[in-house]
Swiss-Prot record:
Protein name, as recorded: Phosphoglycerate kinase
SUPFAM superfamilies in alphabetical order: Phosphoglycerate kinase
Lineage, broadest ranks: Bacteria, Pseudomonadati, Spirochaetota, Spirochaetia, Leptospirales
Classification via PANTHER family: PHOSPHOGLYCERATE KINASE, PHOSPHOGLYCERATE KINASE 1, CHLOROPLASTIC-RELATED
Binding-site list for ATP: 201, 292, 323, 349-352
Annotated InterPro entries: Phosphoglycerate_kinase, Phosphoglycerate_kinase_CS, Phosphoglycerate_kinase_N, Phosphoglycerate_kinase_sf
Keyword Nucleotide-binding appears in the UniProt entry: yes
Length: 396
């Protein structure tokens, strides 16, 4: 996939509108994981080296088109300032007099971060007038926000048609790594898919069947699969509307010659919180009044053996209720198993990345994808609007 590249473009003295994905987790006003900020630093450092005047834009959370202090980028900017050596300024508004004035005052290599673009409903509506107001801040557009590339929004798609547009280094790396994963994976190719809902993973599971050798299922979605096979799942999360599709996926795996693995034992809880009583149960099923909260030790062992012999691994989604420590064991075990593998490893999705970081094995992973939904949609074989807008620039 050919994308317009930054490396050979003269950007000295030019204002560059850089769309990044600074949609990071924040608790009590503090950034708790700065992975997405760090991942875009190579592009920012390249722009600084080229003497560009950088205007950074990002979304944060879902403020529903209204100004909401809870979703302000201010705490993100404070973290960002500690990661770059250039002067960093912050505009408390997205469009209007303040960002226009500040963008014109920038010197070569300096950075202006504008407020959360989703404070304006026109952003998600991809409203042409709003795109023009964003474009008025700059001479050149660079998209490094792979995590938002599946959205046809003003700052990810609309603006790309109004300025000379290029892919950032992270955007390019994401596309190269994920394309290779689908086109020429080393065998055996193992996909580990977790998370709470089958409904959000149906399409990617279907698209992976003709590409993978092993499909390992975990997380809450596993219980819809097990229920479809008449395994007692107690009070576990089950999407009743997707039981038939889950059963069809199991059958499809058999026809395609894909080894689809489901949990054979579980860590269960009597309530969905940290105070829950816990016990381990085997494949005979889960008792009424109890719910599956994590994969058990036998399942971990089964999955570890398959991971050890893999040539390529793609992991998206936790194996249990990872945010609760007593149910994080399965996810952490998978993170460590993947880190020990000699395979090419690609990890995507917030909880999976959090587990990799918590296990302190990020340096052992070939590629950590910053795109949760975007990487899934790419793996589904879908076109990403933010990427398509850049591809059009190559053909023009």
């Amino acid at each position: 996939m050919e994308l317009p590249r930054l490396e050979n473009v003269d950007l000295s003295g030019k204002r560059v509108f850089l769309r990044v994905d600074f949609n990071v987790p924040i608790e009590n006003g503090k950034v708790t994981d700065k992975t997405r900020i760090e991942k875009t630093l190579p592009t920012i450092e390249l722009l600084i080296k080229k003497g560009a005047r950088i205007i950074i834009a990002s979304h944060l959370g879902r403020p529903k088109g209204q100004t909401n202090p809870e979703f302000s980028l201010a705490p993100v900017v404070e973290v960002f300032k500690g990661l770059v050596k250039s002067n960093v300024y912050f505009s408390k508004t997205v469009i209007g007099d303040e960002p226009i004035k500040l963008s014109k005052e920038l010197r070569d290599g300096e950075i202006l971060v504008i407020e959360n673009v989703r404070f304006h409903k026109e952003e998600e509506e991809n409203e042409p007038g709003f795109s023009k107001k964003l474009a008025a801040l700059a001479d050149v557009y660079v998209n490094d926000a792979f995590g938002a590339a599946h959205r046809a929004h003003a700052s990810t798609e609309g603006i790309a048609h109004l300025l000379p547009a290029y892919a950032g280094l992270l955007m390019h790396k994401e596309i190269v790594e994920l394309s290779a994963l689908l086109a020429k994976p080393a065998r055996p190719f193992v996909a580990i898919i977790g998370g709470s809902k089958v409904s959000s993973k149906i399409k990617v599971l279907n698209n992976l069947f003709d590409k993978v050798n092993h499909l390992l299922i975990g997380g809450g979605m596993a219980y819809t699969f097990l229920k479809s096979r008449a395994v007692p799942v107690g009070n576990s999360l089950v999407e009743k509307d997707f039981e038939v599709q889950a059963f069809q996926l199991i059958e499809k795996a058999g026809v395609a010659g894909v080894d689809l693995q489901l949990p054979v034992d579980h860590i269960i809880g009597d309530q969905f919180n940290e105070k829950a009583k816990t016990k381990s149960v085997d494949k005979m099923g889960i008792l009424d009044g109890w719910m599956g909260m994590d994969i058990g030790s036998k399942t971990v062992s089964n999955y570890e053996k398959i991971i050890k012999n893999a040539g390529t691994i793609f992991w998206n989604g936790p194996m249990g209720v990872f945010e609760m420590d007593k149910f994080a064991g399965g996810t952490m075990a998978i993170a460590k198993a993947i880190s020990k593998s000699k395979a090419k490893t690609v990890v995507g999705g917030g909880d999976s990345i959090a587990a990799i970081n918590k296990a302190k094995v990020a340096d052992k992973i070939t590629h950590i994808s910053t795109g949760g939904g975007a990487s899934l949609e790419f793996m589904e074989g879908r076109k990403l609007p933010g990427v398509e807008a850049l591809k059009k620039k190559v053909s023009e």
